[in-house]
Amino acid sequence: MAEAGTGEPSPSVEGEHGTEYDTLPSDTVSLSDSDSDLSLPGGAEVEALSPMGLPGEEDSGPDEPPSPPSGLLPATVQPFHLRGMSSTFSQRSRDIFDCLEGAARRAPSSVAHTSMSDNGGFKRPLAPSGRSPVEGLGRAHRSPASPRVPPVPDYVAHPERWTKYSLEDVTEVSEQSNQATALAFLGSQSLAAPTDCVSSFNQDPSSCGEGRVIFTKPVRGVEARHERKRVLGKVGEPGRGGLGNPATDRGEGPVELAHLAGPGSPEAEEWGSHHGGLQEVEALSGSVHSGSVPGLPPVETVGFHGSRKRSRDHFRNKSSSPEDPGAEV
């Protein structure tokens, strides 16, 4: 049986498993590449002795049930130990666990108590405080802040820069005193105003309207319409285009612009209402034309005037001739 304190395997165990060195290692055990001279026997046992372990479990094999406890729990914690391994592997494992035990001994008792519970489990570390210990130490060594002194106003520190005004000699005023002061001021202003000033037109409230200027909208369109009606009435009188009229004798009749009136315009309505859309422009007798045959009845020329607006470009002036440049054909 291997001793728990030394960690060295016994000769009896090594002789018992000496024939099993050619077996392959288990998948659950892994070694580094540097351990080329090591071999893991198939019957190697891993043993971890914890404070809760029982003394009867050391002699029991892997297939045998553990024996009932026959004594008290060991007082000290025994290190981790593997049985059935080579001396090199056992030495490495012992060195590793010795370093861990040394680090645990060097740790302060308060840290060990907070990091490990009574049953061997790890506890969650305490949350850090709001300020670090270095910061708190620096604040502790710092001198207490002196009380803040309010700043001195500039008019106290430099009174020569300021001018002091006082209202001690001013009497208390009220609404009645303000009203009396205003009326006295207005009375003095009215007395100082000149009386021989002549107001311009429409400024005197007592005027009767003499000399006023009245602005009204011009009625040029209405007057032009009445004038046009009057001219058309004179043209439409009987006997205007007879033989006694010199204008008719020359073959020239009155020129009317009724065809330029737009639809719905007042001129078109007046033209249609008075003449019914049919206007006699000129009445010429047969003797006026040079090629007329005597004895024929006189011919009357009738012009039809519509209310549709036409462009002036389609009409030729009487003074222009087809031979003139720019004349329309």
UniProtKB/Swiss-Prot annotation:
Q: At what positions is N6-acetyllysine found?
A: 217
Query: Its principal location?
Result: nucleus
Query: Which tissues express it?
Result: Expressed in fetal brain, lung, liver and kidney. Widely expressed in adult tissues.
Tell me the GO molecular function terms. molecular sequestering activity; protein-containing complex binding
List UniProt keywords, sorted A-Z. Answer: Acetylation, Cytoplasm, mRNA processing, mRNA splicing, Nucleus, Phosphoprotein, Spliceosome
What's in the GO CC field? cytoplasm; nucleus; spliceosomal complex; U5 snRNP
Q: Where in the cell is it found?
A: Nucleus; Cytoplasm
Gene Ontology annotations of biological process type = spliceosomal snRNP assembly; spliceosomal tri-snRNP complex assembly
Q: Which InterPro entries match?
A: TSSC4
Annotated region (Disordered), positions in chain? 1-88, 104-156, 221-329
Q: What is the effect of changing residue 315 to A?
A: Loss of interaction with SNRNP200. Loss of interaction with PRPF8 and SNRNP200
Superkingdom per UniProt: Eukaryota
Hom4: region residues: 201-250
Phosphoserine-modified residues are 60, 67, 86, 132, 143, 146, 265, 321
Q: Where is this region: Hom3?
A: 150-186
Chain intervals for the UniProt region annotation (Hom2): 77-104
State the residue spans of region: Interaction with SNRNP200: 149-316
Q: What does this protein do?
A: Protein associated with the U5 snRNP, during its maturation and its post-splicing recycling and which is required for spliceosomal tri-snRNP complex assembly in the nucleus. Has a molecular sequestering activity and transiently hinders SNRNP200 binding sites for constitutive splicing factors that intervene later during the assembly of the spliceosome and splicing. Together with its molecular sequestering activity, may also function as a molecular adapter and placeholder, coordinating the assembly of the U5 snRNP and its association with the U4/U6 di-snRNP.
Q: How does it assemble?
A: Interacts in a RNA-independent manner with distinct U5 snRNP-containing complexes, the mono-U5 snRNP and the post-splicing U5 snRNP-PRPF19 complex. Interacts with SNRNP200; the interaction is direct, excludes recruitment of C9ORF78 and WBP4 to SNRNP200 and negatively regulates its RNA helicase activity. Interacts with PRPF8; the interaction is direct.
What is the similarity comment for this entry?
Answer: Belongs to the TSSC4 family.
The name this protein goes by in its record? U5 small nuclear ribonucleoprotein TSSC4
Give the source species.
Answer: Homo sapiens
